[in-house]
Swiss-Prot record:
Residues 193-195 are annotated as: Linker 2. Residues 152-173 are annotated as: Linker 12. The gene is NES. Residues 439-490, 670-788, 895-1593 are annotated as: Disordered. The keyword Ubl conjugation applies. Forms homodimers and homotetramers in vitro. In mixtures with other intermediate filament proteins such as vimentin and alpha-internexin, tis protein preferentially forms heterodimers which can assemble to form intermediate filaments if nestin does not exceed 25%. Interacts with FHOD3. Residues 56-151 are annotated as: Coil 1B. This is Nestin. Residues 1275-1292, 1409-1428 have a biased composition (Acidic residues). Residues 8-313 form the IF rod domain. GO terms for cellular component: cytoplasm; intermediate filament; intermediate filament cytoskeleton. The modification N-acetylmethionine is found at residue 1. Residues 174-192 are annotated as: Coil 2A. Keywords: Acetylation, Coiled coil, Developmental protein, Intermediate filament, Isopeptide bond, Neurogenesis, Phosphoprotein, Ubl conjugation.
């Protein structure tokens, strides 16, 4: 594999050499041949010696044989050479293996040597002990000898004493006893010494055993470490696979978005064309009305003329002909059903003007032939006007009619309307059918689909009459056209006195023309005014039209809702019936709409735009019809056809009203498709109400007035309607989230949860939506069409089916819940009810506002959840994906149900919302347990990290706390804990969501009262923390919706107090470098406090929900900063209060974060996770981002001082940010629970909470860093350098000549590449370390060395792999220059790829990311936004904004990185660097971008770093896998080629994390990472971002991976050069 390029190059060279030799030989032979031929000629001339020729032939044959032999020898030599080359390659491989083995053996020898040295040391110590004991024994022996000598001396002295010469030897016994005594003493001493020696020997043996056990334990630890690393590698591979799936879905979503955008553009163009056509149609219809009047006059004149002619001629044949021709017009009325028949019917009267005798009045008087007045007589009149018969071509009537009518009655526009309408109606009809296929079928209102025929097959006049459904006569003309179409046939015969009749007719037509012209002038004046008004009002009307329609719909819905509420309240059991009846009425109305739409098919696309016009036209049409009625009555009284024509305008008025209503219905159906697939209930309500209000001329006026008033009120009360919209939005989003994790729950529970979260999120989003309302209302069409099209198309169909299903379940639920909810909700409805009513008045507002954000979240959340869940664990992922798929549908159903419920009435919604609150509390308990289970499982999967263990401990403690807390609070705490667990795992996610809900604000306030909660073990610290946090965030004006401004002290004052307290305990607890041990204690203490304070705060549902969220955050942020577990607990409680959905969301996120927590790469991943969750909840993003930002800030400070630096700085710095009243971060405001008018205060509070969250995030990240191993940055740098050197050496050794160096250089640093050229996800540790750690940890300065070691090993392995992949690399190398993301091109592709993501403005539904729409803007703004916190896209998950900004940032940073191609993004973020980075005024975004780049490898630096490594060197490979696939990721991918997962991660992270980072950075930046760089308030983001460079001056160190930034071509050159070398 490795030698492929070398062999190929050598073969080419050999072939060239052989070719040259061959050519030279040929040339020589040719020259020789010439010489020989000349010689031959001479010889032949001399003599024909045949023997010489034979000799020459023989010699030539010999030479040829010799040549062949030489060639064979040469081929054999070449084969031998090739074999030798192969052997050489094998030898080189074996050498590599031997070198690796030698290295391993050297390491083993070093370990053994160290063990031997340890043994020697132990032996020396023991020998010294033995020597000491021997010396002591010797001393004792000496002393004993001396003592014995002394005793012997004494004994010797005794006999010397003069003894009685004769006395017996008395002293002998004494001497013996003394000797015996001394011997015993000596033996005892000896035994004692021997015992001591034996004891010392045993102790020495035990010490040796202990040493052996320690050595064995070390070996086992190493084996276990290897196993764990392998596990982590597998998990990282799974994560990479999941991320690839996510990226694929992102790409699909982007493509779908592009398709929808194209469709929207096409619809816009069609709309403009239809607008112009509408004006023409209106003119045509008005002129047709005038023609009808004039024709009615003609009818009378015809009668008189025919009667006079008949009487004058007195010819029975003529009379019989006339009578025969008309005897059964009614029989023929139904004849022309086909377009041909109609045209024939329309032409026949034209051909036989004399055949209109007396029977005609009867037909005119009948309602059926009323349309004959329109078309039949319009066409019959043409000959009278032209005074010449017109040939029977189907097209003839219209030009003749046009010419004559223009001459006498009609303005020039009539010709245009009729003549031009021929062509227009059919395509329009086709378009209308395409747009509204369901409504094409004929309905019960219209006989036998005649109206459809009218629209499809009628003559141009018919189309002219049909095309403008907006004109007064339209529906009546059409309705009667099908029936009376056959009556045209009755004029087959011509009278004999045709010429005389023509003369009379012309005279009378002149008279009638005058009358008609006067009428037409009046009508035209009115209609001109109408047109002007329509045109003038088109722009505002288009905006107001949807609102007015929504208002009309909701006025009708109000009645329906009032009725439905009455029925529900009175007869809960009857509610399903009424709903079913409503559905039936809706179905029948939809059928009718379909039938009407058939007629209106031409106008239908127009109706979208015409809705605004319909209202003014409705008013003016009614006025015009009234005036026409009066004039018609006056004119017709004098004419025989008075009654007929009089009836006609009356019916026309009614029909016009009905047609207008039907148009509105069809428009609402279109709106359903465009804005809310769920509008169908509204449309159905409209349709049901409109048959009731067929005489809506006045209602239409009132509707318009109400529309205006509603629009004004909407503008005034955007926040209020948004509240309901927000309720709906998050009710839908949350059920999606809850359903993702708990799809098995019944739809009823989901609906209840949805309603509950609606109340919460109504308050939260009311703020942000209040601000965004105007933005959304301004371009509702743009914003709605793009996100709604895809979402609506996806959702609308199942929703229609599911709406019915949901209506059934909702009926049952509503019956049960209405009673309890009514009482509960009446209070909340006082404020929310009005807003809901107003919101219901403007369903448009709901649809646009809801759809961009909710549907984004609804659609995005499943993706985000899938992103998070895949990270949780593959098992959880699989289950979660299944649940996501199942429950996305269910959530769509819940959305449908939601719309229906919302449409029903705000009361029901509120009732159900409270009902949901109750059920959710119950569910929260179950969910908490489930989340604990999942968390425990995840914890088991992640046993490596102490965080996991602490987390499990915390979970258990949370459970205990939940049990301790009152039952009502227990549910909340369970949910909270579950969510906190989830959030802890999602650590930042939970925080995000807590901030997101703005419940942090409420909870900060509520939490403070909970500080004193008796059960809280650490009430003081928590109080301090809570006070600090609540004072930080909450004191800034956060007050619970209930007005729970429970902030303990002045915001400014308590913040400092709370901070010092929080910081001190944190510092104390965190004094442990890891902060893990101390933190568990803090967690334990804080957990009960959190659980209980959360529980205490919870009692008030508003407070519980809002307040707990904050306390959870505050305590989480404060107490949990030391321990991640505490964060999870607090997050759990807070999020439990926030809702089980958050639990679910955070469960996914927690799974991801939690799994990432153990991994050293977790910090890098947290930002992605944050990004994802941020995408899930824009505001929550802010929260998470705050965490990651500060987490990064934390990590930004050296790991050794994790808490003092991170948490203290985070907390201390956060308060100023929190205190900054300027926070305008609307997503957070959106999250703010309750009405909370103090948007800024709540924002600040949420910021404070976020700041806490950030501090906690920092704490977590630092803990993670510490847990993962706090590696000084210096070692990282050294490790990276050594890695680079080793990689270079290995590359030099292992690189086959043919392989481009770029790949190899990249390979060691770059994470593994799969043979497919995809990055091989290294084990999690490696992924985090390689992809993230070298750059990320280097930036973190914590984990780089392990990652370096792993990367070094991986680099070696990768060298082998790279050699295996060399062919692929070469292919990639050849392809790479063409790949969009090839490193040489990386900077451009990066800018380009983000554009794709940036393009969909649908992602940024607030349009905040509009700046990212352009690639350049996306790149520039992406950098700025990332630097600035991406406020433009801050709330956006949108790949456009966040991805664009991240990509832009990554591309910009990459641009910076790429600019310094050699930058090995193993930027050792020393404290100094971090200080520089943090010191840079960068906003939280910068901090996140850098911090995330630092600790998190925050997908920007780590991605840019590791990715740039990949881009620069591996870029060619990565680009195929990552750049192309993950356009966004590709941007980031090129950094150091370190992030194999970085591509996937960067893509997800870039897609999700980039979004997350951008958003987390947006928010997180917005979350002032003050700790990082005095970043000031989140809004200093922009200022700081402007100040900061993407790298904030962090020194970039060349990494191994970045040695060669090859465009593949360079790599190719290198490979060639190496091959030639």
């Amino acid at each position: 594999m490795e030698g492929c390029m070398g062999e190929e190059s050598f073969q080419m060279w050999e072939l060239n050499r052989r070719l040259e030799a061959y050519l030279a030989r040929v040339k020589a032979l040719e020259e020789q041949n010439e010489l020989l031929s000349a010689e031959l000629g001479g010889l032949r001339a001399q003599s024909a010696d045949t023997s010489w020729r034979a000799h020459a032939d023989d010699e030539l044959a010999a030479l040829r044989a010799l040549v062949d032999q030489r060639w064979r020898e040469k081929h054999a030599a070449e084969v031998a050479r090739d074999n030798l080359a192969e052997e050489l390659e094998g030898v080189a491989g074996r050498c590599q293996q031997l070198r690796l083995a030698r290295e391993r053996t050297t390491e083993e020898v070093a370990r053994n040597r160290r063990a031997v040295e340890a043994e020697k040391c132990a032996r020396a110590w023991l020998s010294s002990q033995v020597a000491e004991l021997e010396r002591e024994l010797e001393a004792l022996r000496v002393a004993h000898e001396e003592e014995r000598v002394g005793l012997n001396a004494q004994a010797a002295c005794a006999p010397r004493c003069p003894a009685p010469p004769r006395g017996p030897p008395a002293p002998a016994p004494e001497v013996e006893e003394l000797a015996r005594r001394l011997g015993e003493a000596w033996r005892g001493a000896v035994r004692g010494y021997q015992e001591r020696v034996a004891h010392m020997e045993t102790s020495l043996g035990q010490a040796r055993e202990r040493l052996g056990r320690a050595v064995q334990g070390a070996r086992e630890g190493r084996l276990e470490l290897q196993q764990l690393q392998a596990e982590r590698g597998g998990l990282l591979e799974r994560r990479a696979a999941l991320e690839q799936r996510l990226e694929g879905r992102w790409q699909e979503r982007l493509r779908a978005t592009e398709k929808f955008q194209l469709a929207v553009e096409a619809l816009e163009q069609e709309k403009q064309g239809l607008q112009s056509q509408i004006a023409q149609v209106l003119e045509g219809r008005q002129q047709l009305a005038h023609l009808k009047m004039s024709l009615s006059l003609e009818v009378a004149t015809y009668r008189t003329l025919l009667e006079a002619e008949n009487s004058r001629l007195q010819t029975p044949g003529g009379g019989s002909k006339t009578s025969l021709s008309f005897q059964d017009p009614k029989l023929e009325l139904q004849f022309p059903r086909t377009p041909e028949g109609r045209r024939l019917g329309s032409l026949l009267p034209v051909l036989s003007p004399t055949s209109l005798p007396s029977p005609l009045p009867a037909t005119l008087e009948t309602p059926v032939p009323a349309f004959l007045k329109n078309q039949e007589f319009l066409q019959a009149r043409t000959p009278t006007l032209a005074s010449t018969p017109i040939p029977p071509t189907p097209q003839a009537p219209s030009p003749a009619v046009d010419a004559e009518i223009r001459a006498q009655d009609a303005p020039l526009s009539l010709l245009q309307t009729q003549g031009g309408r021929k062509q227009a109606p059919e395509p329009l009809r086709a378009e209308a059918r395409v747009a509204i296929p369901a409504s094409v079928l004929p309905g019960p209102e219209e006989p036998g689909g005649q109206r459809q025929e009218a629209s499809t097959g009628q003559s141009p006049e018919d189309h002219a009459s049909l095309a403008p459904p907006l004109s007064p006569d339209h529906s009546s003309l059409e309705a009667k056209d099908g029936e009376s179409g056959g009556s045209r046939v009755f004029s087959i015969c011509r009278g004999e006195g045709e010429g005389q009749i023509w003369g009379l007719v012309e005279k009378e037509t002149a008279i009638e023309g005058k009358v008609v012209s006067s009428l037409q002038q009046e009508i035209w004046e009115e209609e001109d005014l109408n047109r002007k008004e329509i045109q003038d009002s088109q722009v505002p009307l288009e905006k107001e039209t949807l609102k007015s329609l929504g208002e009309e719909i909701q006025e009708s819905l109000k009645t329906l809702e009032n009725q439905s509420h009455e029925t529900l309240e009175r007869e809960n059991q009857e509610c399903p019936r009424s709903l079913e009846e409503d559905l039936e009425t809706l179905k029948s109305l939809e059928k009718e709409n379909k039938e009407l739409l058939k007629d209106v098919e031409v106008v239908r696309p127009l109706e979208k735009e015409a809705v605004g016009q319909l209202k003014p036209t409705g008013k003016e049409d009614t006025q015009t019809l009234q005036s026409l009625q009066k004039e018609n009555q006056e004119l017709m009284k004098s004419l025989e056809g008075n009654l007929e024509t009089f009836l006609f305008p009356g019916t026309e008025n009614q029909e016009l009203v009905s047609s207008l209503q039907e148009n509105l219905e069809s428009l609402t159906a279109l709106e359903k498709e465009n804005q809310e697939p769920l509008r169908s209930p509204e449309v159905g309500d409209e349709e049901a109400l409109r048959p009731l209000t067929k005489e809506n001329q006045e209602p239409l006026r009132s509707l318009e007035d109400e529309n205006k008033e509603a629009f004004r009120s909407l503008e005034k009360e955007n926040q209020e309607p948004l509240k309901t919209l927000e309720e709906e939005d998050q009710s839908i989003v949350r059920p999606l989230e809850t359903e993702n994790h708990k799809s098995l729950r019944s739809l009823e529970e989901q609906d209840q949860e949805t309603l509950r979260t609606l109340e919460k999120e109504t308050q939260q989003r009311r703020r942000s939506l209040g601000e965004q309302d105007q933005m959304t209302l301004r371009p509702p069409e743009k914003v709605d069409l793009e996100p709604l099209k895809s979402l609506d198309q996806e959702i609308a169909r199942p929703l229609e089916n599911e709406n019915q299903e949901f209506l059934k379940s909702l009926k049952e639920e509503s019956v049960e819940a209405v009673k309890s909810l009514e009482t509960e909700i009446l209070e909340s409805l006082k404020s929310a009810g009005q807003e809901n009513l107003e919101t219901l008045k403007s369903p448009e507002t709901q649809a646009p506002l809801w759809t961009p954000e909710e549907i984004n979240q609804g659609a995005m959340n499943p993706l985000e959840k899938e992103i998070q869940e895949p990270l949780e664990s593959v098992e959880v992922n699989q289950e979660t994906f299944r649940l996501l798929e199942e429950e996305n549908q269910e959530s769509l159903r819940s959305l449908g149900a939601w719309n229906l419920e919302n449409l029903r009435s705000p009361e029901e919604v509120d009732k159900e919302s409270q009902r949901n609150l109750e059920e959710e509390e119950n569910l929260g308990k179950g969910e908490y347990q489930e989340s604990l289970r999942s968390l425990e499982e995840e914890g088991q999967e992640l046993p490596q990290s102490a965080d996991v263990q602490r987390w499990e401990d915390t979970v258990e403690k949370d459970q205990e706390l939940a049990q301790e807390s009152p039952p009502g609070m227990a549910g909340v705490e369970n949910e909270d804990e579950a969510e906190l667990n989830l959030r802890e795992q999602d650590g930042f996610t939970g925080k995000e969501e807590v901030v997101e809900q703005g419940e942090l604000n409420a909870t900060e306030e509520v939490w403070i009262p909970g500080e004193g909660h008796p059960e809280s073990p650490e009430p003081k610290e928590q109080r301090g923390l809570v006070e600090g946090a609540s004072v930080k965030g909450g004191a800034e004006g956060l007050q619970d919706p209930e007005g729970q401004s429970q902030q303990v002290g002045a915001p400014g004052l308590q913040a400092p107090q709370g901070l010092p307290e929080a910081i001190e305990p944190l510092v104390e607890d965190d004094v442990a470098p890891g902060g893990d041990q101390a933190s568990p204690e803090v967690m334990l203490g804080s957990e009960p406090a959190m659980g209980e304070s959360a529980a205490g705060a919870e009692p008030g549902p508003g407070q519980g929900v809002g307040g707990l969220g904050d306390p959870g955050h505050l305590t989480r942020e404060e107490v949990m900063e030391p321990p991640l577990e505490e964060e999870s607990l607090e997050a759990k409680r807070v999020q439990g209060l926030e809702g089980p959905r958050k639990d679910l969301e955070e469960a996914g996120g927690l799974g991801t974060e939690f799994s990432e927590l153990p991994g050293k790469s977790r910090d890098p991943w947290e930002p992605p996770r944050e990004g994802r969750e941020e995408s899930e909840a824009e505001a929550p993003r802010g929260a998470e981002e705050a965490f990651p930002a500060e987490t990064l800030g934390h990590t930004g400070s050296d790991a050794p001082s994790p808490w003092p630096l991170g948490s203290e700085e985070a907390e201390e710095d956060v308060p100023p940010v929190l205190v900054s009243p300027s926070p305008t971060y609307t997503p957070i405001l959106e999250d703010a629970p309750g009405p909370q008018p103090q948007a800024e205060g709540s924002q600040e509070a949420s910021w404070g909470v976020q700041g806490r969250a950030e501090a906690l995030g920092k704490v977590e990240s630092e803990q993670e860093e510490l847990g993962s191993g706090e590696i000084p940055e210096g070692p990282q740098e050294e490790g990276e350098e050594s890695r680079e050197e080793s990689e270079e050496d290995e590359l030099g050794e292992t690189l086959p000549d043919s392989t481009p160096l770029g790949f190899y250089l990249r390979s060691p640093t770059s994470p593994r590449w799969d043979p497919t050229g995809e990055q091989r996800p290294p084990p999690q540790g490696e992924t985090g370390k390689e992809g993230w750690d070298p750059a990320v940890l280097a930036s973190e300065g914590l984990e780089a060395p392990p990652s370096e070691k792993e990367e070094g090993e991986e680099g070696e392995e990768e060298c082998g792999r790279d050699s295996d992949l060399s062919e692929e690399f070469e292919d990639l190398g050849t392809e790479a220059p063409f790949l969009p993301g090839v490193p040489g091109e990386v900077a451009e592709p990066l800018g380009q790829v983000p554009q794709l993501l940036l393009d969909p403005a649908a992602w940024d539904r607030d349009g905040e990311s509009d700046g990212f729409a352009d690639e350049e803007e996306s790149g520039e703004e992406g950098e700025e936004d990332q630097e600035e916190g991406r406020e433009p896209g801050a709330g956006r998950w949108g790949p456009g904004s966040s991805v664009g900004s991240l990509q832009a940032l990554s591309s910009s940073q990459r641009g910076e990185f790429l600019e310094s191609d050699s930058v090995s993004v193993s930027v050792p973020w020393d404290d100094s660097l971090r200080g520089a980075v943090a010191g840079a005024p960068k906003t939280a975004l910068e901090t996140e971008s850098q911090d995330s780049a630092e600790p998190s490898g925050s997908e920007e630096e780590s991605d840019p770093v590791s990715l740039e490594r990949e881009d620069k060197v591996p870029g060619p490979l990565e680009i195929p896998s990552g750049m192309e696939d993950a356009g966004p990721g590709a941007d980031i991918i090129g950094v150091n080629g370190q992030g194999p997962n970085l591509e996937g991660k960067s893509q997800h992270v870039n897609g999700g994390v980039m979004n997350g980072l951008e958003q987390s950075e947006e928010v997180g930046q917005g979350m002032p990472l003050v700790s990082e760089g005095d970043r000031g308030s989140p809004f200093q983001e922009e200022e700081g971002s402007a100040l900061k460079t993407s790298w904030a001056g962090a020194p970039v160190h060349l990494g191994q991976g970045q040695f060669l930034k090859f465009t593949q071509r360079e790599g190719d050159r290198e490979s060639w050069s190496s091959g030639e070398d």
